[in-house]
Amino acid sequence: MVLTIEALKHLWRVDESRVGRTEPLPLDNRHYVNGHPLCDAFTGLAQIQFGLGCFWGAERLFWQLPGVFSTAAGYAGGGVPYPTYREVCSGETGHAEVVLVVYDHTVISFEQLLQTFWESHDPTQGMRQGNDIGTQYRSVIHCTTSEQYAAASASREVYQQQLNTAGYTAITTEILHPAPPFYYAENEHQQYLAKHPNGYCGLGGTGVTCAIRLQV
């Protein structure tokens, strides 16, 4: 599925009165867990954006994986530049809560990241994830290369067959390439569950294994 930002504005009923900002929100450019930069050129590393509900729990899933160099919480897929959390939660910017995952493909494969993505949430729920309801919680994969797009699309077909067998409905995950702009969330949301170990995490998978072929 290839959607333009203009199409997304219509789809999510973006409030055109929300004009956003011309400059990024302030960012402490140091990962709270591993000390690596959150924002960088990341030369020699690969990048992908995953949205699977609230980005607090989603980010923790990925920073724990060997081969993941950095992660950051942010917003993407909408029509308002540099939005705030409050604006995104209004449902009027069109953005999804996403996690930017920067990884070393010689240590962890893209297929391994996809397996974590599919198995860690319910991709059939549309504009919600568990008790978290709203367009910002939709399931998305924003690809930075055509190879990622092909692999993600193929994995969706494989996982759909497995979900069908288990009695689930159609996957609603958006897979986009090229990736829309990623806007870093406020500092308080970065690595939130490392700063607040008892904080809220509403993620929950289907219990269905994603049996895609892993390239290791």
Swiss-Prot record:
EC number: 1.8.4.11
Matching InterPro entries: Met_Sox_Rdtase_MsrA_dom, Met_Sox_Rdtase_MsrA_sf, MsrA_MetSO_reductase
Domain of life, per lineage: Bacteria
Active site per the UniProt annotation: C54
MF terms in GO: L-methionine-(S)-S-oxide reductase activity; peptide-methionine (S)-S-oxide reductase activity
Record flagged with keyword Repressor: no
One GO BP annotation of this record: cellular response to oxidative stress
Keyword vocabulary terms for this entry: Oxidoreductase
Catalytic activity, as annotated: L-methionyl-[protein] + [thioredoxin]-disulfide + H2O = L-methionyl-(S)-S-oxide-[protein] + [thioredoxin]-dithiol; [thioredoxin]-disulfide + L-methionine + H2O = L-methionine (S)-S-oxide + [thioredoxin]-dithiol
Oxidoreductase in keyword set: yes
GO cellular component, one term: cytoplasm
Protein purpose: Has an important function as a repair enzyme for proteins that have been inactivated by oxidation. Catalyzes the reversible oxidation-reduction of methionine sulfoxide in proteins to methionine.
Protein family according to the UniProt entry: Belongs to the MsrA Met sulfoxide reductase family.
Protein name (record): Peptide methionine sulfoxide reductase MsrA
